[in-house]
Amino acid sequence: MFDAKLTHTVEDFAALLLPLSENDLEREWRWKDHDEEGIRFACFVTLQELRHLAVTLATLRPKLTPAQHILSQYHAAYMDLQAALLGLSREDAERVPAEGEWSVRQAYSHILGTDIGFTSVVRYALESHRAGFWKPARMSDEDEMRIIGMSEEEYKTLTGGPLDGMLAYHRGFHPTIIEEFSKIKDKELDLPSTFWEETRFPIQHRLYRYEAYFTQHTIQIDKTLVAIGQAPSESKRLIRKIYAALAEAEGMMIGAEKIDDTAILGTASSILERTREIEGLLR
């Protein structure tokens, strides 16, 4: 679904730019007629290319279904969180900003656990409705473990483990959710589902909750990073914008079974060439 070459190319560009100081960003770099803003301007060129790619892809595919559109919003929130955590050491991930507050690792554990929980609720509701036996009762613990594909012990090991382990798991789990739920039909969005609340919210509500929940706790993590002395540098702020643009372009790939990848590969090649050029300047 998502293009691995494009994703990895943007990640490599981000990894190169992340440690740069403001002085580094001002080092000479030229793009066409722009020769006064230095390496910093490479971020803006990359941003524009990714935004243009999103616009181009929108013209090459059928209109996003409502479910696919909601999932693209969720994907944008996921990517924003990933960008916020770039460059964070394991030691800093464990630092608590104040007594009684969560470390970044604890906050991410909560996000991942809830992501898994939301997914189990939607999967169970779809499974039950499609089989014609949906009931308003909550799923059993056995059904929940079956649906998430891990035992309770495995779940606790994952969410109680180091941040890098959770990030690695999430990188595989997230696109699986997108791919699976991109096939939800419009009429299924209004079907009821059961979680901890008394209200049997429709599946559509559950899908919207992904983005809302990520946003809530990404802000929490942003505040924590500032409190532990890890406020974002200019480079990281620029990279976060680039990840947002990548997310928009990838959002246009959701549910697109056949799409001309010429524009995708062209954008990836352009960013790769720019990365190599800047690498040469920094040596």
Kindly give the residue locations of the regions a language model identified:
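A short small-residue
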Residues: A58, G149-L158
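Short alpha-helical functional segments enriched in proximate histidine and acidic residues
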Residues: L16, A84, T114, F118-V121, ...
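Short, contiguous alpha-helical
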Residues: M1-T7, E11, E26-L71, E94-I148, ...
